[in-house]
Amino acid sequence: MAKRKLIALLCAVCCAVTTTVFYAAESKAQSRQYINGTIVSIGGRSTRARQFSLIVNSYTTPGQVRELNDALQRGGQDELLRALSGMDAGRVRIGSGVGVTANAIIAEPWGEGGTKLTVFYQRDVRFFELRYGTRSQDYRIGYAEIFLDRNGRGEGTLIPAARVRLRDGNTWEVEDFGVYPARLMGLRASGRIPVG
């Protein structure tokens, strides 16, 4: 009899824990913002279109932006990469792959009730770039600018290989690796990020 009570109590505790974990995961998923659309790459002989997704877990705080700016002033792009590596604001996915961590997502008011998102991520440098010392290995940052209207629709640009420099002490200059920036089209946002 005591054994049955123990098993019943254990089952009740497991159900309570499972329910709590489920609701915590569900509320975390609801506090994300999803931005989906199409990326159109214009390069070489053909134009290529693929799916684009940005999952925003949190926006980069003004303190973190100051930290990135200080790192760029102190040691250039290498120091900026070090500072970015400690940040995780979301995920950038192109096509059907897993994607890469969006290290910084900076949100600013734009237009009439819209939002401008600036996204920085550490791009994966391919083996052949390192092996053969290609110039592209100096362009280790991915960069995107997304403009969303008040209804969560918009467009933007993405530079998959960029170099970041500081001009006049406080202006960031983003240089692409000699290719046209890709266009982000038909973007739609869903979900909300809590402010605070």
Task: State where each predicted segment sits.
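Long, low-hydrophobicity ectodomains and other hydrophilic envelope-associated domains
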Residues: 30-196
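Bacterial N-terminal signal peptides
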Residues: 9-20
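Intrinsically disordered, low-complexity segments enriched in glycine/proline and serine/threonine
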Residues: 6-8, 29
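N-terminal secretory signal peptides that target proteins for export/translocation
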Residues: 1-4
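Sec/Tat signal peptide C-region and signal peptidase I cleavage site
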Residues: 21-29
